């Protein structure tokens, strides 16, 4: 499936949260912390408002975006304003 964001939206593939602690204890899905970072997969057509490009790693607001599953992997469809920083 291919998703093309519109306007000032950005499609981000979210980073996976840790499933095990350093000591080897498995963390259940319900207790895993929601990740606030990911990789930009696609950028909407209103690109002059969005200061990120495909392939960059970004941090985003914790409760922002609409979750989307693409080929079994978690993604978020975010507004450009919900991106807080670029990770270098």
Curated annotation (Swiss-Prot):
Quaternary structure note: Heptamer of 7 subunits arranged in a ring. Interacts with the chaperonin GroEL.
Gene name in the database record: groES
UniProt KW rRNA processing keyword: no
Keywords tagged on the record: Chaperone, Cytoplasm
Localization, UniProt: Cytoplasm
GO biological process per UniProt: chaperone cofactor-dependent protein refolding
CDD domains for the chain: cpn10
Function statement: Together with the chaperonin GroEL, plays an essential role in assisting protein folding. The GroEL-GroES system forms a nano-cage that allows encapsulation of the non-native substrate proteins and provides a physical environment optimized to promote and accelerate protein folding. GroES binds to the apical surface of the GroEL ring, thereby capping the opening of the GroEL channel.
Family: Belongs to the GroES chaperonin family.
Entry-linked InterPro entries: Chaperonin_GroES, Chaperonin_GroES_sf, Chaprnonin_Cpn10_CS, GroES-like_sf
GO CC annotation terms, alphabetical: cytoplasm
TM spans (from-to): none
Alphabetized NCBIfam families for the sequence: PRK00364.2-2
GO MF annotation list: ATP binding; metal ion binding; protein folding chaperone; protein-folding chaperone binding; unfolded protein binding
Species name: Treponema pallidum (strain Nichols)
The protein, known as: Co-chaperonin GroES
């Amino acid at each position: 499936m291919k998703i093309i964001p519109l306007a000032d939206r950005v499609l981000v593939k979210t980073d996976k949260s840790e499933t095990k602690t350093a000591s080897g204890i498995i963390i259940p899905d319900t207790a895993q912390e929601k990740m606030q970072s990911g990789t930009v997969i696609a950028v909407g057509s209103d690109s002059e408002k969005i200061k990120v490009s495909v392939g960059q790693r970004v941090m985003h607001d914790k409760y922002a975006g609409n979750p989307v599953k693409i080929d079994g992997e978690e993604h978020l469809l975010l507004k450009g304003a919900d991106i807080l920083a670029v990770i270098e």
